[in-house]
Amino acid sequence: MAGEKKTEVVKIMNKKILAAALTATMVGSMFSTVAGAEEAKNIPELTTEPMEIVFWHHSTEDPSKGIVERAVERFEADYPNIKVTMTAQQNDTYKQQLVVAMSSGKAPNMYIHWGGGPMVEYYKSGFVNDITDMFNTYDHPDYIDAAVAQASYDGKVLSIPYGGLSGCDIFYNKTIFEEVGVEVPETIDELEDVCDKLLEAGYVPFTLANGSKWTGSMYYMYLVARHSGNDEFNAAYAQEDGGSFTSEAFIWAGEKIQDWVKKGYFNEGYNSLTTDNGEDRALLYNNTCAMMLQGSWNVRNFVNDSQEWTDANLGVFRFPEDAEAREKGVPQNVEIGTAIGNGFSFNCWKEDGSVDQEKLDACYVLATQYFNDDTYNEEQMTLAQAIPSIKGYEDKIEDPRMQYVADVFFNASNVQLWYDQYLPASVTEVHKNCMTELFGLDKTPEEIGQEQDVAMQAALAE
């Protein structure tokens, strides 16, 4: 049986879907009316002299890799004097290498990030151009307000939204649920009942690849949000008026996670598996696990691995509510995610420290006109199952799972940005290590709360 499972996983993980190979000309033009009719654009006039843009991103596999490359190809075709030198690395490696590059003073001219605290620190360290005036002067897509807000800091626009909306929901195997006779849970108590029945039937409830650390944080974030809305996190972030990562909601969330660990709700070896390699999805494919709490970008990964398996088995539901907190008036529609997915920031400077405006102009045009044109957005939606952070696109979603994610996102009272992106970079590392310790039962919720408090206080004092 184990051999059959391994063979099936290899088949699924290596299977390439036809859609990933489609070129821009093969994708329908059903979204052409969103951006409006073609007309003269108000964009910077770019240099005709030879120029190189060093561009880093994290799209290492199709379909996203091809979408990025084709956007750059369209730009280079229109501006043949400008060469875009691209480097792509997987998420966790990318983050590490970007910090290394900045530490050595060799950061790329254009790079993606996840917004939040790290973006602010990149800016304060001198690796982000302030593009407020350009954003207010030149054409750009009609981004949703939340995306512009997330791309900004202290009244300054510091990045161009890229990648689209990303929610966080529970993906599940509908076939297993039907076999076991369980329904989609609406409350955390019901979720625990489902998990117990799955265990009795021989299935591990959740697949988790917490070697990436931020994956475990999703459970922590949602449990805190369901128990207290945004209030306790906001207070802990400010470290004022008694705010602390040891407050009631954080302790409750940590204890709940450790209780789930002890009950066997997660797969074996979860702290050593990585999500970049799809090791969490593999445990869904071989029927070891029944559910996975993850970002909505995984719809693309599921389809890319196997359209057939996805259509036959994959369902999605929002993180269940805390019934007791709801009775106390705590909002239950705070969702975890991001309004921009990623942002493009620019690092264009001359040797004397002044802004290299010609290169900055070129980066701005590439980011706003080629990574956000009709072709790019069509491919994002049809090939990558992404939801552009641009007004009007939410009505064009065809994939039912992504439509569900979008509905949850747009009906949220508030969208909490991932802790590992919202927190200052120094606190983020502490937080992620705390997730390893929490899920590993190495430290108590109180102990990791104290560690995060110390890190937050140090960051605020800088």
Q: Locations of the language-model features?
A:
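Extracytoplasmic/periplasmic solute-binding protein
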Residues: 154-162, 168, 192-242
